[in-house]
A protein has these predicted regions:
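Short helix- or helix-capping micro-motifs
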Residues: 26-32, 85, 89
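Aromatic/acidic, Gly/Pro-rich catalytic loop(s) in extracytoplasmic/lumenal soluble domains
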Residues: 310, 316-319, 323, 362-432
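Transmembrane-lumen/periplasm boundary regions of multi-pass, lipid-linked membrane glycan transferases
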Residues: 87, 98-203, 209-224
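Transmembrane-helix motifs of polytopic, lipid-linked glycan transferases
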Residues: 2-18, 56, 60
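Specific aromatic-rich, kink-prone transmembrane helix
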Residues: 49-69, 80, 84-85, 238-241
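Signature aromatic-anchored transmembrane alpha helix within multi-pass, membrane-resident enzymes
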Residues: 248-285
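Transmembrane alpha-helices of multi-pass, membrane-embedded glycan-processing enzymes
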Residues: 1-9, 30-33, 50-53, 238
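Short acidic/glycine- and proline-prone juxtamembrane loop motifs at membrane-interface regions
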Residues: 41-49
């Protein structure tokens, strides 16, 4: 639903800065982005609501600043911009770049706007919306701000060109290589030709809405491992600018290549998830075990989306057997009804929780340091914590290196894809 809404919002943004052709081209560019189509339009991630609120806020930011086809400033739009920017920040912290880009633009090119009360009202509304988040993070040990700050902390770190290279290449792929080429062409076209004043305003605010986010995350990636989708919202305004230039040039053939690339990636990705038809290169083993299945599927990211139904059914069978044994032995053996599953990290704890525990009428609890369990520290406490000698299940996966002591294996489960084993799970119970 939000994916469709986002496409409509991009079309409306195109109309705002140009005409129907600009809106159509902007919608095509948005659809051609793997980040927009898959992460924002298909998956259930923080990026999903972020994308919708980001685009809505950007629409009203452009109206307020007069970066539109009629070049008229409408400062009252800052109220709506602030509302949606606040909602974007509630979805993900990167929503703050909406205000950063706008304020930088106003500081350099439209300082008189700082005297307008609508601007400050919009800023206040955004801050009001994120105040609960700020308060919770300042009073809770499981601070999300602290967690994410640690992920990008670079003091004392040596530059890692490989990490930077992965970030650049990832951004190139997430946002569609064909469209990156179109973007570069649009920038060259603008730079080499004199544009009208309203186009200058659009170009300037696009730069301030995009460059800071991309530059900051590229800088972080020089010292820490980052993910390309962190900076991907910065490309939304860049697609608008590209659409405006392509509409001016009346070019439409490049969209065949752009959408064709996305279609091919989606088709091949779906086939790979379902069949594993593309052989993946083997990475260096992390363990020295002689067990041939110790790291089965470890380096295949497509398995994140495969095999959960098989594991769920296998766990359900083990659960029924253990509960029957518990009942027959008056609690001396087996596992009590509703016994929780123990995990040591928030990932794959969240997967186990949704795909395995919930369908089988139980929950997941975690143990370990806060930086590993994160929000599941609080979730575990809400679920009653872990009691002394509490009987718990543990699921060891060949895809993850985590393990716990004092376990008694109950069953070994192989997930099959295309008649080949791709993951091994060992379902155990904690013996304490």
């Amino acid at each position: 639903v939000l994916g469709t809404l986002n496409t409509w919002l991009v079309w409306r943004l195109g109309l705002l800065i140009g005409n129907k052709k600009t809106g159509w081209y902007a919608a095509l560019l948005y659809t051609g982005s793997l980040y927009a189509t898959v992460l924002c339009g298909t998956f259930i991630l923080p990026d999903t609501p972020l994308g919708a609120f980001y685009l809505a806020s950007l629409y009203f930011m452009l109206r307020a600043c007069g970066c539109t086809n009629d070049a008229q400033e409408k400062p009252s739009s800052f109220i709506w911009a602030g509302l949606f920017a606040g909602a974007a920040m509630l979805s993900k912290y990167t929503g703050a770049f909406l205000w950063l880009g706008t304020l930088l633009y106003l500081l350099l090119y439209n300082r008189k706007m700082f005297k307008n009360p609508w601007l400050w009202a919009g800023l206040f509304l955004s801050l009001l919306l994120v105040t609960p988040v700020i308060w919770w993070n300042s009073t809770n040990p499981a601070s999300g701000l602290s967690f994410h700050a640690d992920r990008v902390a670079f003091f004392g770190k040596k530059p890692q060109l490989l990490s930077l290279g992965r970030e650049v290449l990832g951004s190139f792929l997430y946002n569609n290589p064909v469209q990156i080429i179109l973007l570069i062409g649009a920038l060259r076209y603008y730079i080499h030709l004199k544009r009208r004043q309203r186009t200058k305003k659009l170009f300037r605010i696009v730069l301030f809405q995009s460059v800071p986010m991309v530059a900051i995350f590229f800088f972080f990636s020089l010292f820490r491992d980052t993910l390309p989708h962190w900076s991907a919202p910065a490309f939304f305004p860049l697609w608008l600018f590209t659409a405006a230039v392509l509409a001016k040039q009346n070019r439409h053939k490049p969209f065949r290549w752009s959408l064709g690339f996305t279609a091919v990636v989606l088709i091949l990705g779906t086939l790979q998830i379902r069949t594993g038809m593309i052989p993946l290169p083997k990475a260096e083993a992390k363990t020295t075990s002689d067990d041939p299945y110790a790291e089965l599927g470890r380096h295949d990211v497509t398995l994140d989306m495969y095999g959960w139904q098989q594991l769920t059914e296998a766990f359900g069978r083990v659960q029924q057997e253990q509960e029957a044994l518990y009942s027959a032995s008056n609690g001396e053996e087996g596992m009590p009804p509703g016994a929780a599953i123990l995990a040591t990290r928030w990932f794959p704890a969240a997967h186990y929780d949704y795909y395995v525990a919930k369908p089988n009428g139980t929950v997941v609890k975690t143990t370990g340091p806060l930086d590993k369990t994160h929000k599941y520290e609080a979730i575990t406490q809400d679920r009653g914590g872990i009691q002394p000698r509490e009987r718990l299940y543990y699921i060891a996966s060949s895809r993850y290196p985590q393990s716990v002591p004092d376990v008694l294996p109950l069953d070994t489960v192989f997930v099959y894809r295309n008649k080949k084993p791709v993951i091994r799970y060992i379902i155990s119970r904690i013996t304490h």
